[in-house]
Structures are given as C-alpha cells and as structure tokens.
C-alpha cells in the first residue's frame, strides 16, 4: 500500500472547470475503470489492477514514458474520491477529485493536488527545491490539471475521446 511521506510539507495546486452535465453523468465518467484512456491528454495507457472503490489501484503510463501507480484511499459515491499517486511505496502526491452541482445541468469538476517535493525532487539538492517547485513544478502542474479537466469536459459534453496533447504539450508528462 502506498503511503504519504512522513515529515513532508505538501504544496497544493487546484483547478476547477464547469461542465454542462449533471453530477451523476460526471460521476459515471470519473468512476469508471481506465477512464484516463478516453479523457486524459497525456495518458498513453491507463491499466486497471483492481477496481473496488476506495481499494482501487491502477497504473498510468504517460506519453513521455513516465509510469505511476494510483492507490485510491477514499471513495465518496457520486461526489468524488481521493488517491495517492507515485512510483513506489511513497506517494509523490495526494489527489482529490470533487464534483459539485452548480445549476441545472451545470456542475463543477475540481482536482486538488498536494505535491510532496521531498519525493518528486529527491534527486536535486534540497537548497534548490523551493526554486524548482515554484518556477517549474507548480506552474506545470497548474497547466496539467487544466488540461486533464478540459479532457474530461470534452469527453463528457461531446463523447469525443481526447487526443494526445489536445490542450497543449506538458513536458513533465508528454512529448511534442
């Protein structure tokens, strides 16, 4: 089971988009196994290991070859879920997906990411973590979250599968 790092300060990044759909329709999409294959612009392959609500585990291989495992830890039926993502036993980040009804057939989909720099930047001297995090990682992760949610928005509203880099390239996860 993947664990959060101990004694690690997390940094939050979040993005929200309005989607022309009910929370039930959004939930059906975000809670189906291997959904990233249809909706994620940087996902080369999303493979389910097991799909059992808060015990779900899957793998994501990004377009640039990076492979991460997702361990779901909380499941809020019809509302969202929480997961840990990383390469091995220690998570690189904690992720919260949340659906909120706004108006008739308009809902908000949010993804909140808590990044653990001691894990993702461990190959760099600690003195550089602040600069790398604030000038590279956080801006790239903001773009990443926007692209991911736009992918789900497109799939939910039109039924059209998202293509590679559909909303722009992100060098942390894809190749041009």
Enumerate the predicted regions with their spans:
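Extended beta-strand/beta-hairpin segments
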Residues: 12, 161-166
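Hydrophobic ligand-binding cavity/cleft-lining segments
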Residues: 1-51, 173-176
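Short hydrophobic/aromatic-rich motifs at helix boundaries and adjacent loops
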Residues: 7, 17, 40-42, 67-70, ...
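Glycine-rich portal/gate segments that line the openings of hydrophobic small-molecule binding cavities
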Residues: 37, 47-94, 104-108, 143-162, ...
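Generic structural detector for well-ordered beta-strands
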Residues: 16-20, 71, 98
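Beta-strand/loop substructures that line and gate deep hydrophobic ligand-binding cavities in soluble
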Residues: 87-147, 154, 165
């Amino acid at each position: 089971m993947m664990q959060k790092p101990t004694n690690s300060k997390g940094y939050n990044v979040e993005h929200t988009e309005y989607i022309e759909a009910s929370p039930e329709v959004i939930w059906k999409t975000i809670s189906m196994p291997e959904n990233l294959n249809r909706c994620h612009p940087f996902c080369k392959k999303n493979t389910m290991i097991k799909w059992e609500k808060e015990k779900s585990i899957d793998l994501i291989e990004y377009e640039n070859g990076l492979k991460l495992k997702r361990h779901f830890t909380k499941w809020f039926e019809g509302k969202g879920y929480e997961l840990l993502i990383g390469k091995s036993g220690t998570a690189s980040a904690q992720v919260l997906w949340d659906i909120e009804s706004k108006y008739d057939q308009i809902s908000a989909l949010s993804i909140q990411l808590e990044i653990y720099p001691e894990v993702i930047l461990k190959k760099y001297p600690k003195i550089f973590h602040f600069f790398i995090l604030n000038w590279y990682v956080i801006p790239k992760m903001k773009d990443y979250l926007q692209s991911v949610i736009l992918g789900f928005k497109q799939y939910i509203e039109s039924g059209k599968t998202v293509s590679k880099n559909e909303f722009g390239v992100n060098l942390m996860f894809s190749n041009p």
